[in-house]
């Protein structure tokens, strides 16, 4: 019995997943002055040291019995090395539904936190998502809505007393993403590209009746003064 066909099929599926949210969304990410999550991980880690976990987690599309497309989960994680030291790294994929919760595989993000604690390895979060709440798309998929929660938050908090935790806000970050940036020992933003807030300008305007720009609400200058991040003026 040969496994050659199965191995080739697995490789094909990995290639589909590596396409992230598709060429159009990748191009949009680049035009916004931002790298994709895979490009970020590739530049961060030592060459060829990244060992990905859960690459095929996501939503599959079939034509009969043949897989024709994969929408991967919008979170990429694994282990790698920085200057020879082993670390755990996890990053949001903004090219898949803007990092929204309806395209996530919840256990995948939580696993990155758990494995870092279990292996006693530094944890690096590359945050570029819209949070952990629901959306209209969530309602379309599940037929219901829900009150956002994070049952794994105890793991996030526990990590602060056990391992080094670093976070980088690499785009507009709201909700749970903002909490993940704040709950770290060292955090950084990209000036003019990153904003960190609990809720974005449309929600704030609806609540207070006053329009506000995202830089004024949660830009790097605001967050450095408020103590939300340690370094908010990095340039790319």
What are these regions (language model features)?
Residues 26-27, 77, 113, 178, ...:
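Short glycine-/small-residue-rich flexible loop motifs, especially phosphate/cofactor-binding loops
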Residues 35, 40-166:
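Long, structured ligand/cofactor-binding scaffold of large enzymes
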Residues 127-233:
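Conserved catalytic cores of soluble enzyme domains
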Residues 1-62, 182, 198-233:
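Amphipathic alpha-helical segments at domain termini/boundaries
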